[in-house]
């Protein structure tokens, strides 16, 4: 019922047909199976057999940010923006929050803007969550997407196991139930907006609606928040938590602005590189 309601919202808000939404949400192989159903399907993904690693403890700064996030959720700020500088350890905070949701019997949806980021995170998260991790994105084969889709829609499995579904934009359309938390990492990234074909939806906005339908919490993470999210946070519509210290106390790099127009006029360029940049590289 909630999945149909979400599809209906996407159809109305983004002005497309419900059929276009369903086409984007359902694995392509499901249509083929209706026409020519195979006699037997085998599991495509081997179960994880590697070691399960413990979750690393947070630094005092990270722990303070995590506590602030949970305090805001307790104060009915269901959407929180985590404004953390680059390399501040936002992912570590995500992992702790994910584990808390799994311990509470809830599922978690973890959205990243690029499929490449999904690949990088998978190995790290799988060492912690094992077979509870489900990866879903558009570069999977039809058979792989169907397998994961069925794993998510298997209600008996959902009852006995809680999942962390990590994926790019299309993962927000999955029929995951019993969601306790939706994480939208790098929430400012334009890749969350579908351009072609329809439905031309924004995964961040869709995730917020999905969370409202399931009474789940939302955590938006970014070092450079989008204008709209930061505005809502400043106005108090969203909760705001700032993580301004890089993990391990590493200082932020110094930034120098170079006027390339002046560099060209002064002939202080080496091919396409300014002389100050070349000097710093040589150092």
Model-based region annotation:
Residues 133, 255-257:
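Generic structural signal for residues in well-ordered beta-strands
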């Amino acid at each position: 019922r909630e999945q149909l309601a979400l599809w209906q919202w996407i159809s109305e808000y983004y002005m497309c047909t419900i059929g276009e939404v369903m086409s984007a949400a359902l694995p392509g192989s499901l249509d083929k199976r209706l026409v020519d159903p195979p006699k037997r399907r085998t599991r495509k993904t081997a179960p994880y057999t590697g070691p399960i690693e413990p979750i690393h403890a947070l630094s005092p700064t990270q722990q303070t940010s995590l506590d602030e996030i949970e305090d805001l959720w307790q104060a009915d700020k269901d959407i929180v923006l985590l404004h953390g500088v680059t390399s501040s350890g936002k992912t570590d905070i995500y992992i702790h929050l994910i584990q808390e949701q799994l311990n509470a019997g809830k599922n978690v949806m973890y959205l990243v803007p690029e499929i490449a980021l999904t690949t990088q995170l998978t190995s790290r998260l799988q060492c912690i969550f094992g077979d509870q991790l489900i990866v879903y994105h558009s570069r999977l084969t039809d058979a792989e997407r169907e397998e994961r889709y069925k794993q998510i829609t298997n209600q008996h499995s959902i009852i006995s196991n809680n999942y962390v579904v990590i994926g790019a934009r299309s993962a927000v359309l999955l029929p995951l139930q019993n969601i306790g938390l939706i994480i939208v990492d790098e929430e400012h990234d334009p890749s969350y907006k579908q351009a072609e074909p329809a439905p031309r939806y924004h995964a961040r906005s869709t995730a917020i609606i999905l969370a409202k339908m399931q009474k789940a919490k939302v955590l938006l993470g970014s070092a450079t928040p989008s204008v709209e999210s930061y505005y809502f946070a400043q106005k108090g519509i969203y909760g705001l938590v700032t993580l301004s210290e890089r993990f391990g106390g590493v200082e932020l790099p110094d930034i120098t602005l170079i006027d390339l127009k002046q560099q060209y006029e002064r002939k202080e360029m080496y091919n396409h590189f300014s002389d100050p940049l070349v000097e710093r590289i040589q150092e």
